[in-house]
Design a protein with these regions (language model features):
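Basic, alpha-helical nucleic-acid-binding regions used in initiation and control of genome expression
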Residues: 1-12, 18-22, 33-98
Length: 98
């Protein structure tokens, strides 16, 4: 699953050397594994606990990723829209493969 998320991010021009790359992977992986919608701030707190950082740092790093994605896209997304769109796209592909 993690590899599919990384491949999708790289295909969108977001590379692993960016700080928020791993944060996005963790959040998307958690969303895909969950059977309910979770508030994005709760997910930021989860990642902050896992990575021993602050929620603000996680949000700022993800905002960097989203702004990089928005530069190459016609549609401008906010953090939560980007994360949930990515998660559902990958989940749809994952379910199709099974």
């Amino acid at each position: 699953m993690r590899r599919m998320i990384e491949d999708e991010l790289i295909a969108n021009g977001i590379y692993p050397n960016l700080i928020g790359f791993e944060y996005v992977c963790i959040i998307v992986e958690y969303i895909i594994g969950s059977d309910r919608v979770i508030k994005i701030m709760k997910l930021y707190e989860l990642v902050a606990d896992i990575k021993n950082t602050t929620t603000e740092a996680v949000e700022r790093s993800i905002r960097t990723i989203v702004s990089k994605y928005n530069r190459g896209s016609d549609k401008k997304l906010c953090n939560s829209e980007f994360i949930y769109t990515l998660a559902w796209k990958i989940k749809g592909r994952y379910m199709k493969d099974e």
